[in-house]
A protein has these predicted regions:
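Short coil turns that delineate tetratricopeptide repeat
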Residues: 82, 123-127, 161, 194-195, ...
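Register position in tetratricopeptide repeats
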Residues: 97, 142, 176, 209-210, ...
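N-terminal leader/linker segments that initiate helical-solenoid repeat arrays
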Residues: 3-131, 437-438, 445, 451-456
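TPR alpha-solenoid repeat register
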Residues: 87, 128, 132, 166, ...
């Protein structure tokens, strides 16, 4: 993946020198969702010490050790020296990791306080360090404040343009803002600077957005091969499975999910993947049981939504309603802790009842950014409110990169049907089902019934 080679999966030569320490290296974890991406800087992480350095504590936590213990140790250091900016930065990073690892957003304000305190102390001594700026960028990404993330990333790049992590912050922000050409160029620079799990996974996403599923799988497989720990490999293997599942390859996805689970039995998303495989194979009870276990261990909204829709499909409407209440409570908790959830609210409320709130949230998010998925949310919210002419324009914009996403095609088909374009509706709905006939427990059955009613064939 040398310059201008996003279409290649050949491992590149490392042509720029790494110039940062361990704390900066931690950021790759937060940006791709892995579990141990810290690079060695020549220090033996296993060597006994009486007072571990802040970055060593973060490295230990991110490599799979007790994140709570790492945070407690950093807090002890800060009680002894409240103006230890390096420990504050490390504490902020560890709190972001705790939020991600536990689906508990109450850690984000603590991360914010620690990182801003570090920046204030560093500013008094001259300027915030590269590590702190990258940490603030990672926190902004986690809270879906992509404009701020881009700002912090660019400031960090001025201080150190030789580290791959800074291009992760910048590129992730650009892609979420809908600045695709800029993002793809940034990801290429990341690959050229520091090839590895974080860089290859971004290449995979860039290819997926452009409808290149095979290339996306190749790049994510390269990420798995490059993984430096079982936890990183489990993360990448799971995402290979996600790519296959979204492309309708249930058997291949099942193999990848099981491989992920074997690499790291504690990795909950692999269990969610296997629950979706059970749904795809028609075992609704097994799918529900799988998601109940997932939600008990990791109550992220996406998992609770799947559980609620599976329960509805099984005719267990009262239990499904209880899970929908949980989804709204999660969204409220996220918002209360500084996470922007307008995109999620727009799609969820368009599906489950509050059409006015869906459109408010979609418009609010569109004012902030113009990604294909925000365009899709605008389309679906407008459709829910009966404005299908406007919805179609947004739906077409959502598809302009050529993304092979069954849900985007389903939305397009239902909008065309509402406009009386039966042929167009059949075309889009059939395409959705050919991409992935199991894309949603709620919408896939509707798509199948609608195509049959309109006389189409999948």
């Amino acid at each position: 993946m040398q310059a201008a080679e996003l279409g290649s999966t050949k491992a590149p030569r490392r042509n720029l020198r790494k110039a940062t320490g361990v704390v900066a290296g931690a950021i790759a974890l937060f940006l791709i969702g892995g579990a141990g991406l810290l690079r060695s800087t020549g220090v033996d992480a296993d060597a006994p010490t009486t007072a571990p350095a802040p970055e060593a504590l973060v490295r230990s936590a991110l490599a799979g050790d007790d994140i709570d213990a790492a945070i407690a140790a950093l807090q002890d250091r800060l009680r002894a020296n409240p103006e230890d900016a390096e420990s504050l930065t490390s504490l902020g990073l560890a709190e972001v990791q705790r939020a991600r690892a536990t689906a508990d957003p109450t850690a984000y304000p603590r991360a914010d306080q620690a990182l801003r305190s570090a920046a204030r102390l560093e500013r008094a001594a001259g300027a915030p360090t590269y590590q702190t700026l990258i940490g603030l960028g990672a926190l902004s990404l986690a809270r879906h404040d992509f404009s701020d993330a881009l700002r912090y990333g660019r400031r960090a790049a001025v201080r150190n343009p030789y580290d791959g992590d800074v291009f992760g912050v910048i590129g992730d922000a650009q892609i979420e803002l809908g600045r695709y050409d800029d993002a793809f160029a940034t990801f290429q620079r990341m690959v050229d600077t520091e090839p590895g799990v974080a860089a290859y996974s971004r290449v995979s996403y860039a290819r997926e957005l452009q409808g290149e599923t095979r290339g996306a799988i190749q790049a994510m497989t390269a990420a798995e091969t490059a993984a430096g720990s079982p936890a990183d490999a489990a993360w990448a293997a799971f995402h290979v499975g996600e790519l296959r599942f979204r492309d309708g390859d249930v058997a291949g996805a099942a193999r990848d999910y099981r491989r992920s689970q074997g690499l790291d039995p504690s990795y909950v998303p692999a269990r969610a993947g296997l629950a979706r495989v059970a749904f795809a194979r028609g075992d609704l009870n097994k799918a529900i049981a799988g998601y109940e276990e997932v939600v008990a261990r990791y109550p992220a909204a996406e998992h609770v939504i799947w559980l609620s829709e599976l329960l509805d499909l099984a005719g267990r409407s009262e239990e499904a309603g209880q899970q929908r209440d949980v989804v709204r409570a999660i969204q409220q908790l996220l918002a209360a802790n500084g996470v922007n959830v307008d995109l999620e609210i727009a799609l969820y409320e368009a599906d489950h009842g509050d059409r006015t709130e869906a459109l408010r949230a979609a418009r609010s998010e569109w004012d902030r950014r113009h990604s294909v998925y925000v365009a899709d949310a605008m389309a679906w919210a407008l459709h829910a409110n009966g404005d299908d002419r406007a919805a179609l324009a947004f739906s077409q914009r959502a598809l302009h990169l050529g993304t092979r996403d069954a849900l985007l095609r389903y939305h397009a088909g239902m909008i065309r049907l509402a406009l009386g374009d039966r042929a167009g509706a059949v075309r889009d709905l059939t395409t959705a089902l050919r991409i992935n006939p199991n894309f949603s427990a709620l919408h896939a059955p509707i798509a199948q019934r609608t195509v049959a009613r309109l006389g189409g064939a999948v």
